[in-house]
Amino acid sequence: MKRQALFLSIFGVTMVTMPAFAADGASGITGVRWGKNAFNFEPMPSGPQPLRNLIRRPDGTGNAGQLVGDYHNPILKPEAAAVVKQKGELAAAGKGFPNAQDQCRAVAPPFTFAMQLSFQMLPKNNGDIAILYGQGDNVRHIRMNGTHPANLVPLPMGDSVGRWEGDALVIDTVGVRTDAFTSVDRFGIPQSDAMHVIERYRLIDGVLAKAAQDKYEKAEGIVGGGARFSGVNPDTGLKGLQLELTMEDPKVFTGPLTVLVTYRRLMTEWQEQVCADNPVEHYKDEWIGLPKADLADF
């Protein structure tokens, strides 16, 4: 089945034939806007675990508005644990610490998946995939069946190659350019130039997707207990999307860390979001000055 798209130009009207997207199966991952309400990562049933918030509400749930990461987690090397501890002390004292998103930097993997960012995958004419994120018009370009260049130049969103493994989309990313605001998650785990990220996306039953999101939101909480995507489609008859994310960074982690991130379909239309750069950070009625570069990084 094909669908027709109508394009207007100064030369007249052009009809372009585009492939239709199936509701399920491999192609059901693309052409859909996905979103989630909780921050950070869902744990795997076993193995190394992502950091947990040490600040708990009276009911035992995590307070996503005050981020004190478990720096004793054995997945962290001592240097990384010290950074998380320092940032946690700032948060516990009521002070914020900046990250790539609130500083209008590229929200690159794996931090992309620790945020509430919506996204949509769009197939390109040459078979590659573009991923649009709901933050500052961030875009990733996935070269399908490609390889990383031998002389890799670090890029704001890294270098990504992908492949289909049955009905799963697998994306391999290296070469993310780091700066003072780059981190793995919202607890401030540092990220080095050695970070290697493998994303494995697959469609899952809608009931399971809702259950996974509800369970994690209840356990770890969302900002203020209420900042949510109002456009999440409540129809559990629609497939959800589960990301199995593996992060390897020998300068930060003691071994590979694999986590889950569950997304559901959004009903709202794509909305452009413009990020305005700012030399200060506002956190709990306090303005915090931020470091400034002497020279441009381009």
Give the label of every model feature segment.
Residues M1-L8:
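Bacterial N-terminal signal peptides that target proteins for export
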Residues K2, V16-P19, P45:
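Position-driven detector of the extreme protein N-terminus
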Residues A22-F298:
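PEST-like low-complexity, intrinsically disordered acidic/proline/serine-rich tracts
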